[in-house]
Amino acid sequence: DVIIEPLMKLNVKYEYYHINSLLDPVFDKKIESSEAFLYTNYFGLKQDTVLYLSRFYPNLIVDNAQAFFAKPIEGVDTFYSARKFFGVPDGAYLYTTALLDIDFPIYNPIDNINYLIGRITDSAEGYYKDFQESEKRMSNQEIHRMSVLSDKILSSLDYVSIIERRRFNYHLLYSALTAFNKFDFSISENQNVPLIYPFYTSKAGLRQQLILEHVYVPQYWQNVVNKIDAKCLEYSIANNMIALPIDQRYDEKTMNILIEKISNLNNHLS
């Protein structure tokens, strides 16, 4: 819905396409010069598909909101989100060849920092309602430049160590859980830096049990469930894929505890 919002606001016509079990597009329509093809670099794991599509679709737009560390391709319009990867109240990046002569105002994040502070001093659970309210406030916003606060935070981060930690944590989960996962996205032979570890399972109730175990697992694409047939692959993925955390806040000990919890639950659930 975040993508659809500006399209509806600007009265831009759009249509959906299907994806397969590799999260690649199922699409063979010719793209006209007045049209564009938008593809999401899912979880930061689909850079090879992005590169492939860039060779065939001159009007490709890449959604790298889930792939902060993926390099943009020359001549391909690409956008990124800092909020999905780091503890900032706002912030995004746009790579484009278009010339923008508009001086956008700087965003004031004062109303959207409470949940970030609460997560540090207390817990994510205790401030989830604040997070939801912050998300609502971000909807239907006019375009702004990144806030000074987010800019300062992002300028102070050790990105090399963040990349290493995310990849290390992903490898831990991949090694332990691949046998139980309908997805198999290895990062051993590429430079992908994942957002999460996508655990696609048929075990009913695993998400709810993890939440009870105080493991925060956001559900992606809840809007998809209400829009497509339950027999579609996309419906199954949206319903049954669990986004396991791998980010830079978690050390090896924490990841091993997570693996143990999932393994135990996986053995007891039908």
Each model region followed by its residue ranges:
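PLP-dependent aminotransferase-like
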Residues: 1-68
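Short, glycine/charged-enriched secondary-structure capping and boundary segments
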Residues: 6-9, 51-54, 74-77, 93-94, ...
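PLP-dependent aminotransferase class I/II
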Residues: 18-19, 38, 101-270
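Short, acidic/turn-prone active-site loops that include or flank metal/cofactor-
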Residues: 18-23, 65-67, 82-86, 221-226
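Short, charged, surface-exposed secondary-structure boundary motifs
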Residues: 23-28, 48, 69-75, 87-94, ...
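Active-site PLP attachment segment
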Residues: 75-118
